[in-house]
């Protein structure tokens, strides 16, 4: 009888452990559950999500305030030990028109999760900053340990498609032990790229041109963008 109980108990432990682990992982938002239209910003957060930050500003040039909504999973912010939990994030863009808000973009692979900052942030919740500057959506976030990566993305409304186009990308990698900095800045409208490497008190800069291509907020992946930058910078 005991030989029959042990396998069942083992399976139950594995199942419960897997369930707990899945609950601790950051989730990815289901874009299909984000409404196409709503009468208030709060209604763009589907069940299981909430607004972490609400940034307003004119994004399409009609002089009417629009919204960049930073969403986060609606899970407890801290665990039993008082440490921040791992919660996924998403960015929703809503344009205002005739007292209604229309969804204009959802980024599910752009903002880093609340525990994705690495040893650099330790047990402090990892930020993901979103601002609107002169009609441009700016996303800035960093992570790492001894080496810290800082990435900045800039998106601007494209009237012909009704989408938000990546127009600029900056990435820097800083070795905190040696203070050496390697960085690049890309203008996706022109293809102009500038690379900079610090060596002692001297900065070495190089300019080049990359093939122009369109990357939209809905499709962008922060992991892919950073991996490509590391490859270009030979990090």
Functional labels for PLM-detected ranges:
Residues 74-77, 145-146:
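Short glycine/acidic-enriched loop and turn motifs that connect beta-strands
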Residues 50-59, 120-134:
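Beta-propeller blade termini
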Residues 1-5:
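Positively charged n-region of N-terminal signal peptides that target proteins for export
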Residues 22-28, 124-235:
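Acidic, small-residue rich beta-repeat scaffolds with periodic aromatic anchors
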């Amino acid at each position: 009888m005991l030989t029959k109980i042990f396998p069942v108990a083992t399976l139950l432990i594995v199942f419960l452990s897997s369930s707990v682990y899945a609950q601790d992982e950051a989730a990815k938002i289901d874009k299909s559950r984000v409404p196409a239209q709503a009468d208030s910003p709060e209604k763009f957060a589907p069940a299981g999500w909430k607004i972490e930050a609400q940034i307003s500003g004119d994004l399409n040039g009609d002089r009417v305030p629009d919204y960049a909504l930073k969403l986060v999973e609606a899970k407890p912010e801290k665990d039993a030990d008082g440490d921040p939990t791992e919660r996924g994030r998403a960015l929703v863009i809503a344009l205002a028109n005739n007292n209604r808000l229309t969804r204009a973009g959802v980024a599910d692979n752009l903002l880093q999760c609340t525990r994705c900052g690495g040893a650099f942030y330790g047990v402090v919740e990892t930020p993901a900053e979103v601002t609107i500057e002169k009609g441009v959506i700016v996303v800035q976030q960093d992570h790492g340990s001894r080496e810290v990566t800082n990435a900045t993305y800039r998106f601007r409304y494209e009237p012909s498609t009704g989408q938000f186009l990546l127009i600029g990308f900056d990435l820097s990698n800083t070795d905190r032990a040696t203070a050496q900095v390697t960085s690049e800045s890309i203008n996706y409208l022109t293809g102009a790229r500038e690379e900079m490497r610090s060596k002692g008190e001297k900065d070495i800069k190089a300019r080049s041109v990359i093939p122009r291509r369109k990357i939209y907020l809905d499709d962008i992946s922060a992991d892919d963008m950073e991996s490509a930058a590391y490859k270009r910078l030979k990090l």
